[in-house]
Amino acid sequence: MASVWVRDALSGRLQLVRVAPGAVALDLLYQEGTAIPLTDFYVKCNGHLADLEEKLQDGHTYSIEPRLCGGKGGFGSMLRALGAQIEKTTNREACRDLSGRRLRDVNHEKAMAEWTKKQADREAEKEQRRLERLQRKLAEPKHYFTDPEYHKQCHDMSERLEEAVIKGLQASSSDVVSAESDDTRKRKKDMYASKGTSSKKKCFWTGLEGLEASSSSDSSSDSDLDESPCSSSSGSKHHEYIKERLGSPESSSSSDGLEEASSAGSHQMLKGQTSGSESDNILEGPSSSAGSLHVPQLQSSSKGTEHIQEPQTCPAESEQNTETPNISDGSEENPTTVTNSECKSVTSAANTGQNEQILDDGHKFASPTLLEPKSELQQSSNTEPSSIDLVAYKTVAELEALGLEKLKLELVALGLKCGGTLQERAARLFSVRGLARDQIDPSLFAKPAKAKKK
């Protein structure tokens, strides 16, 4: 009989077992006597797996161990792949420490502890930044201009400042001059109207016809009319003045008629029929050196009536003025006495100088027809031609030097619009320089005046 040492599979106790000669390893499993199937155990001899049909040897140690149910396999390759990745990466947060906690959680806890410890420092720094921001807002802003374009514009503006001031002064001075001239003209008209109402009876002298026109009458009469307003005279003063004016032998017959009329002391006016348009001709005063007689100019109308006007003369010493009646050749020769209420004052056009006395060359007086007062704009537009040569002016600036009033007269003489500033008037007049009337832009012409409703 042989003796072998057997280790229990469940308890792990080692005990001595006597077996019959010729017994095999399988017999040890039968001696176990458990309900577990024999297929779930195997026998090991001295640490080596023994075949179940192997004979038992005396004195050897046999262990009965249960079988472990393993997987289906294939995990080796997976482990080898993970091992390679673990060697390559530096992120160990997915690993665990010896206590079984993941390194990710451990590191997060450490970071939270440090952040909480520095919370007070962060609050203090935030408050410091807030105070600094408030101080910056309370402080006065400092402007730094480093734009080269800005500096260039400032430099150019300072250079053009003097030129702009000079142009502004020129424009303002021209406006002031025009305003003063308008005020002076209005004062003259007011003074003329006041004198006309309070003066003596006005008379219109006729009967001087056939007198020769003076060659230099236009310029002197214009200057006389511009210098002082005129009013009608009567009585002996008028008689003496007419005698002095008509003292030459050429007008002896006319002066006789005038003397008779003035000595009678009546202001005689003869009403005549005038079928043609009124045309005013200027009779200028006597020159200072020769004292020669200035004769009126004759101009025939379309129906054969002749209108003669004698210029108004304004002697400063006697303040005597004459009016401008119209005379027709075919009128009756009977003089008619006119009262002061029937005499109408005729306004003088200072710019044109065309209100004249009309005389017939006969000894007797024809009945006059009172002239209707004309506005300054109508007289200047109908009678005064353009007095400047536009071709002589090369730039608009040269035309601006003429002033607002002169430019207005030139534009009215051409029938153009006369409104606007000094620069606009000069530019408008310069645009028609050297052009015929049919070549001028129609938009530049002034619109015809509308007839006033009666």
Curated annotation (Swiss-Prot):
Family per record: Belongs to the SDE2 family.
InterPro entries per record: RNA_Proc_DNA_Dmg_Regulator, SDE2-like_dom, SDE2/SF3A3_SAP, Sde2_Ubi
Motif interval(s): PIP-box: 33-46
Xref: Pfam families: SDE2, SDE2_2C, Sde2_N_Ubi_vert
UniProt superkingdom: Eukaryota
Domain notes: The PIP-box (PCNA interacting peptide) motif mediates both the interaction with PCNA and cleavage of the SDE2 precursor by a deubiquitinating enzyme. The SAP domain is necessary for specific binding to DNA.
Gene symbol of the encoding locus: sde2
Propiece residues: 1-71
Main location: nucleus
Keyword field: Cell cycle, Cell division, Coiled coil, Cytoplasm, DNA replication, DNA-binding, Mitosis, mRNA processing, mRNA splicing, Nucleus, Ribosome biogenesis, RNA-binding
BP terms from Gene Ontology: cell division; DNA replication; endonucleolytic cleavage of tricistronic rRNA transcript (SSU-rRNA, 5.8S rRNA, LSU-rRNA); mRNA cis splicing, via spliceosome
Biased composition (Polar residues): 271-303, 318-357, 376-386
Processing after translation: Upon binding to PCNA, the N-terminal UBL (ubiquitin-like) propeptide is cleaved at Gly-71 by an unidentified deubiquitinating enzyme; the resulting mature SDE2 is degraded by the DCX(DTL) complex in a cell cycle- and DNA damage dependent manner.
Membrane-spanning segments: none
Role according to the record: Inhibits translesion DNA synthesis by preventing monoubiquitination of PCNA, this is necessary to counteract damage due to ultraviolet light-induced replication stress. SDE2 is cleaved following PCNA binding, and its complete degradation is necessary to allow S-phase progression following DNA damage. Plays a role in pre-mRNA splicing by facilitating excision of relatively short introns featuring weak 3'-splice sites (ss) and high GC content. May recruit CACTIN to the spliceosome.
Biased composition (Low complexity): 248-266
Native organism: Xenopus laevis
Coiled-coil intervals: 109-143
Compartment(s) where it occurs, according to its Swiss-Prot or TrEMBL record: Nucleus; Cytoplasm
Spans annotated as Disordered: 170-193, 212-386
Site feature: Cleavage: 71-72
Name of the featured protein: Splicing regulator SDE2
Organism placement in taxonomy: Eukaryota, Metazoa, Chordata, Craniata, Vertebrata
GO molecular function, one term: DNA binding
